[in-house]
Amino acid sequence: MKSAARILAVGLVLAALAIPQSGMAGGNGTAAFEQLKSLVGHWETDKSNMNKATLDLELTSGGTAVLEKFRMVEDGKPVEMITLYYLDGDQIKLTHYCMAGNQPTMHGTYAPESKTLKFELESITNLKSADTGHMHHATYTFIDNDHFKTTWTFRKEQKDAFTEDVTYVRAK
């Protein structure tokens, strides 16, 4: 009888651990997705920290995804990348289609009190080796309705190589 009670107790503990708890990382994905949806429109860099670039965000796939299109010219050549933001259950995620030729997928944690959305690498496709360069982290800071900042961290040779901080202004 004691072993049956012990098995039942262990089963209840395991079941409790399997149930998502409110307030855990990623449990606020819906709020983060709503914040990203508020960015739909045309944006330009504030030009204080990089070449002029544009960012277009659009709601797609029946409202289930936000598609971001980044465009700029560097050394006379066009630079274009896209990032797709979406929910997986109540977890906000992104997949970034990078000029580096790989596609990192990241999961995010939203902190409404600081207006920040932080993404961490979850998986990546087309990565030739662990030393190959790729985007590894991203942070969005929502300043107001017409301004937001992104910070992307590029990792190469298994260490952070550089960070790009860009502030965007909504084009009117």
Indicate where each model-derived feature is located.
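Polar low-complexity intrinsically disordered regions
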Residues: 1, 21-23
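Bacterial N-terminal signal peptides that target proteins for export
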Residues: 1-9
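Hydrophobic small-molecule pocket/channel-lining residues, especially in calycin-type beta-barrels
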Residues: 23-172
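Bacterial N-terminal signal peptides
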Residues: 9-19
